[in-house]
């Protein structure tokens, strides 16, 4: 393989681009006031952007009923391609009744800004309980993903989209790297194997450990923190990004790591979302994807390693990206280093278990996470942000 070839093809073979050209954009903006409109929530706004930039390839729009049913029940698109999360645009029945198949629908973000259009090809109802149970493994409203499903509209709108305006990420301009751009960066660096890492939490020592373990076996590491909609108690995106900047400056080899933002929203769908996250990183050009403990989980809804086991149920060749599975890492007091049960000689009493949840709890109590939890510079940044 030469430096000028992509290490891996996008999911489905082609990278989707539904970002309107300047000519298209001006034409659509001129029509905007005359179009029927739908207001998107934060998640749908993120989904629109991810579809348009190719992050959700091969999707070119919000799912029709055939794809939706296959994804919910069988984890693949209607054409058989693996896909684990429904990507839909849901509206109330009244809104759906006011629209006709064939309409060009104006899409506004939560502030009312005109951000895209939908070429409406289909309207269909769906079973919310079935979606919740199949995708999230529960129908409890306290699950944040399930809550979204039950509170959204009863009708899904389907069809191709065009994106006119990106979500604003003014604090991260240099990290807004789309799939086409990340692939170009990987080619320029001559990387043939790239491992992606997904997170919604500030980096702690366990994350750093598994990232570096993975980096020992590949050409490059793609750090891809999520900056779309998350739970209200998650650490804000700007704080998480500052922590990663600190790590890049002091603790990672800069020529082996690329940091970029992921504009997607969290679903908290555990095992299914682990597959989804892997496919998204495949579109960004990653050949491998790190799957750790309780990936994309919330509460106690999923088993510790369910998100790893689900990869064994899919055709590896059809999936096309290789999961790198890691056990739960901890700080070993006996060896004074990070380890897992595979490498540590210590018993439970000498293991300091780390998690984003524990870090958040310490910060809320006004405690500075110790060096066993976080690098000192990161701990100071988190503490300062919590006070502010």
UniProtKB/Swiss-Prot annotation:
Keywords of the record, alphabetical order, are: ATP-binding, Nucleotide-binding, Nucleotidyltransferase, Transferase
Q: Which residues belong to the signal peptide in this entry?
A: none
Q: What class of enzyme is it?
A: transferase
Q: Among its keywords, does the record have Ribosomal protein?
A: no
Which pathway?
Sulfur metabolism; hydrogen sulfide biosynthesis; sulfite from sulfate: step 1/3
Q: Which CDD domains match?
A: ATPS
Entries under InterPro entries matching the protein: ATP-Sase_PUA-like_dom, PUA-like_sf, Rossmann-like_a/b/a_fold, SO4_adenylyltransferase_pro, Sulfurylase_cat_dom, Sulphate_adenylyltransferase
Catalysed reactions, as listed in the record: sulfate + ATP + H(+) = adenosine 5'-phosphosulfate + diphosphate
**Record has Nucleotide-binding as a keyword:** yes
Q: Which GO terms describe its molecular function?
A: ATP binding; sulfate adenylyltransferase (ATP) activity
A Gene Ontology annotation in the biological process aspect, one of them, is: sulfate assimilation
EC number, as in UniProt: 2.7.7.4
Under the heading NCBIfam families, the entry gives:
PRK04149.1 (NF003166), sopT (TIGR00339)
Which family would the database say this protein is a member of? Belongs to the sulfate adenylyltransferase family.
What this protein is called in its record is Sulfate adenylyltransferase
Q: Which organism is it from?
A: Acaryochloris marina (strain MBIC 11017)
The record lists the lineage as: Bacteria, Bacillati, Cyanobacteriota, Cyanophyceae, Acaryochloridales
Q: What gene name is given for the protein in this entry?
A: sat
